[in-house]
C-alpha cells in the first residue's frame, strides 16, 4: 500500500488504492489516526487513507488496513508474440494485462476456462510461463493513447502497460515543468501532514 504498486493486473482490476476501505496510520507525532470506513457507504469527508497509498511513508506510516477483495479467477493464461498491442486490446473483452516493449507483446487472460480459451483463439499468440521482469529504475505515466510514440521516445529496455499508461524504464526519468507543478502541490500536502519533517526524512513526496 505504501509503495502504491498495483501489479500487472491493473488494466482489468484497477489501482490498489481503489480497494482500500479503511486504514490506521501513525502521524508525525506518533498518534494513531483512523480514516475511511469498513464499507464504502460508511466513508464521509476527505478520503485520507487513499492519499497515503503510494506516499512511501512521507505522509504517515500505515499500521493497519481494511481492503476489498475479489475471488481468484479459475483460469489464468499468459501468452506472447509479435502484434499491434492496441489492435489486440480492441479485440479482447477484458484482458487482465497487456505489456509491450515496442516489439513483443505479453497478454494475461483470466476468467472461466471456456471464456479464456475463446479469447486466446482471438489473439494469435503462443502460451508462455509469464511476463518479463519489469524494469524498476524509472516509472513514467502517460495518456494511454500516447504509448504509440514510445519507440520514438526511448531506446530498448522499456516496458509499457497498454490501456493503463504506465511505462517502466531502465533509467531514471527527468521531471518536466508539469511534474514540478505537481511537486509543489505535494510539498504543500507534506508540510500540512508532517510539519516536523519526521516522516521518512530525505524521501521526496513525488
Sequence positions of predicted segments:
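Hydrophobic positions within alpha-helical membrane elements
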Residues: 62, 69, 115-117, 199
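FAD-binding subdomain of flavoenzyme oxidoreductases
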Residues: 1-96, 104-106
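Conserved glycine-rich FAD pyrophosphate-binding loop
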Residues: 31, 102, 122-206
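Short amphipathic alpha-helix segments
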Residues: 78-98, 117-120, 139-157
Amino acid at each position: 500500500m505504501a509503495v502504491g504498486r498495483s501489479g500487472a493486473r491493473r488494466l482489468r482490476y484497477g489501482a490498489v488504492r481503489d480497494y482500500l476501505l479503511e486504514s490506521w496510520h501513525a502521524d508525525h507525532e506518533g498518534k494513531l489516526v483512523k480514516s475511511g470506513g469498513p464499507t464504502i457507504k460508511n466513508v464521509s469527508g476527505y478520503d485520507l487513507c487513499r492519499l497515503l497509498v503510494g506516499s512511501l511513508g512521507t505522509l504517515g506510516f500505515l499500521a493497519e488496513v481494511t481492503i476489498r477483495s475479489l475471488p481468484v479467477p479459475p483460469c489464468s493464461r499468459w501468452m506472447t508474440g509479435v502484434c499491434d498491442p492496441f489492435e489486440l486490446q480492441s479485440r479482447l473483452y477484458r484482458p487482465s494485462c497487456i505489456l509491450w516493449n515496442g516489439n513483443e507483446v505479453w497478454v494475461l487472460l483470466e476468467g472461466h476456462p471456456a471464456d479464456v480459451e475463446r479469447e486466446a483463439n482471438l489473439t494469435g499468440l503462443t502460451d508462455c510461463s509469464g511476463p518479463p521482469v519489469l524494469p524498476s529504475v524509472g516509472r513514467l505515466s502517460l495518456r494511454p493513447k500516447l504509448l504509440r510514440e514510445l519507440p520514438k521516445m526511448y531506446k530498448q529496455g522499456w516496458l509499457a502497460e497498454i490501456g493503463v499508461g504506465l511505462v517502466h524504464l531502465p533509467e531514471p526519468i527527468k521531471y518536466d515543468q508539469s511534474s514540478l507543478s505537481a511537486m509543489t502541490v505535494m510539498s504543500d500536502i507534506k508540510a500540512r501532514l508532517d510539519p516536523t519533517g519526521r516522516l521518512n526524512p530525505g524521501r521526496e513526496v513525488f
